[in-house]
């Protein structure tokens, strides 16, 4: 279930202010954020945002296709290590 349309999309105010300052000055540098729940706005396109995944900040380059999605969708919090392998040792135990 999505967010109510009357409320509008959520974006962290500090993050949006940093993006606006960078757009005005023309500078491009990595912005660190812990706000995984912020919606990606069109003003963010072309910037690199380091999104926290619980351990480190994952750099995410924002493209036009990402607009409307959340920042946390592009920084996975879990690492999939694969399912159990069929090895000689595991089959010998049966």
Swiss-Prot record:
InterPro entries for the chain: Ribosomal_uS19 (IPR002222), Ribosomal_uS19_bac-type (IPR005732), Ribosomal_uS19_CS (IPR020934), Ribosomal_uS19_SF (IPR023575)
User: Which Gene3D superfamilies does the annotation name?
Assistant: 30s Ribosomal Protein S19, Chain A
Keywords for this entry?
Answer: Ribonucleoprotein, Ribosomal protein, RNA-binding, rRNA-binding
The molecular function terms of the Gene Ontology recorded here are: rRNA binding; structural constituent of ribosome
Q: Report the record's Gene Ontology biological process terms.
A: ribosomal small subunit assembly; translation
Does this UniProt record's set of keywords contain Glycosyltransferase?
no
Highest taxon of source: Bacteria
Q: Which GO terms describe its cellular component?
A: cytoplasm; small ribosomal subunit
Q: Show the Pfam families listed in the entry.
A: Ribosomal_S19 (PF00203)
The record's comment on protein family reads: Belongs to the universal ribosomal protein uS19 family.
Record function comment: Protein S19 forms a complex with S13 that binds strongly to the 16S ribosomal RNA.
Q: What is this protein called?
A: Small ribosomal subunit protein uS19
């Amino acid at each position: 279930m999505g967010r109510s349309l009357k409320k509008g999309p959520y974006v962290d105010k500090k993050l949006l202010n940093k993006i606006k300052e960078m757009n005005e000055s023309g500078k491009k540098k990595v912005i660190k954020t812990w706000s995984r729940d912020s919606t990606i706005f069109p003003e963010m396109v072309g910037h690199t945002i380091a999104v926290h995944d619980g351990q480190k900040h994952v750099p995410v380059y924002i493209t036009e296709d990402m607009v409307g999605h959340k920042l946390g969708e592009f920084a996975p919090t879990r690492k999939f290590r694969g399912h159990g392998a069929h090895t000689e040792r595991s089959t010998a135990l049966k």
